[in-house]
Every structure is written in structure tokens, then in C-alpha cells.
Amino acid sequence: MDYFPVIFSLLFVTFQGAPETAVLGAELSTGAENGVQSPPPSTPWRPRRSKRCSCSSLMDKECVYFCHLDIIWVNTPERVVPYGLGGSSRSKRSLKDLLPNKATDQAVRCQCAHQKDKKCWNFCQAGKELRAQSTMQKSLKDSKKGKPCSKLGKKCIYQQLVEGRKLRRLEAISNSIKASFRVAKLKAELYRDQKLTHNRAH
């Protein structure tokens, strides 16, 4: 058999990689002497962004503003835009992070980086409660504070009936919106699961 092409290609690959490994080994040895480890020369060093917490949704601008400490927020005529969000280095994520539990996904607004950060923890928990409280619940409280109709007559009773119908209609609309969001979320999770299994197959 003719082993010459195989040996030649192996030697070529070995000698091409040798200078880089020699330089890398020299840098690691000098870094070890100084007590500082430098990053490999092939990847440029980028500072990691300091994050107070991780938002469950980047559409929640208040959460993003609270969690990302080093973003410069620029006011534009249309909206407030985070400047410098792109190009940040990401650490590798586990499969557990890609497919969060349904209970934690619905319940938690964000996850704090440090467990002892009480302000962050209160923000994430308060955000969950604020989102759960709807305008319908506020209007129910307002209607309970209304005047009793015993002295005011039929007009007051009619007005309360109309407001009751409006509240029931608002409740039906909010329930249908919640149901449509649940369906969309389930479809997105199903698509994500199919995409992950498809990527693993190839």
C-alpha cells in the first residue's frame, strides 16, 4: 500500500499546528509564573457584561432595564432603546436553560444572579404579582366601592347592571386573550422541541 500521501498530510497538519501551540505554551508558562492566565490569541478578549439578573422575556423592557447594569439607555422619539446590547459574549447554556419548566416559566419574571440580593429578588417577585393583577380585578374593586342604590332608585340599579355587563365582557375578553397566549406559547414550545430534536438527529 502507498502510505506516503497519508504520512505527508499528517506531517503537514502537525507542522502547521506546531508554531501556534509553541506560542500558546510559552504564553501559558509566562502567565503561570506571574499568576495571571491570559486568553488564547485566536479569540479577542471581551469583558463580560455585568448582569444583576436574567429576564424571562426580553420584551419586558422594565426587567431588562433593571437587570442589565452596564447598558446605556438612549431615548429616541419612538421608544427607549438599549445601546450596546448586541455583541456580548454568551456563556454556554445547558439544555435545562433552553427548555425551562412550565411552572417556573409562568411564575418567575426574572432570576437573580446572586441569591442574597434582596432588591433583585423583591423586583422579580413583585413583577410576577403585578402582571397577574389585571385591569378587570381593579375595576371589580372600584365597583365594590360604589354607592349603594337603595336611595338613588332605578337609574342607579340600571347603571350598575350596565357596569356588571361591561365587567363580564372584559373578563371574557381577557380570558380569551390569555387562552390565545397559552396556545401560542404551547406552539412555540412544540416548535422549539421539534427543532432541538431535529438538530440532534443531524
UniProtKB/Swiss-Prot annotation:
Induction: Induced by intermittent hypoxia in the lung. Induced by chronic hypoxia in the intrapulmonary arteries. Keywords: Cleavage on pair of basic residues, Disulfide bond, Secreted, Signal, Vasoactive, Vasoconstrictor. One of its GO terms (molecular function) is signaling receptor binding. Endothelins are endothelium-derived vasoconstrictor peptides. Probable ligand for G-protein coupled receptors EDNRA and EDNRB which activates PTK2B, BCAR1, BCAR3 and, GTPases RAP1 and RHOA cascade in glomerular mesangial cells. Also binds the DEAR/FBXW7-AS1 receptor. Promotes mesenteric arterial wall remodeling via activation of ROCK signaling and subsequent colocalization of NFATC3 with F-actin filaments. NFATC3 then translocates to the nucleus where it subsequently promotes the transcription of the smooth muscle hypertrophy and differentiation marker ACTA2. Its main location: secreted. The record marks W73, V74 as: Cleavage. Belongs to the endothelin/sarafotoxin family. The gene is Edn1. SMART domains: END (SM00272). Residues 110-124 are annotated as: Endothelin-like. Disulfide bonds join C53-C67, C55-C63. Residues 1-25 form the signal peptide. Residues 26-50, 74-202 form a propeptide. This is Endothelin-1. GO terms for biological process: adenylate cyclase-inhibiting G protein-coupled receptor signaling pathway; artery smooth muscle contraction; axon extension; axon guidance; axonogenesis involved in innervation; blood vessel morphogenesis; body fluid secretion; branching involved in blood vessel morphogenesis. InterPro entries: Endothelin, Endothelin_toxin_CS, Endothln-like_toxin. It is found in: Secreted. Highest expression in the adult is in lung. Lower levels found in heart, kidney, brain and intestine. In the embryo, expressed in outer and inner pharyngeal arch surfaces. Also expressed in endothelium of dorsal aorta and arch arteries, and in epithelium of pharyngeal pouches. GO terms for cellular component: basal part of cell; extracellular space; rough endoplasmic reticulum lumen; Weibel-Palade body.
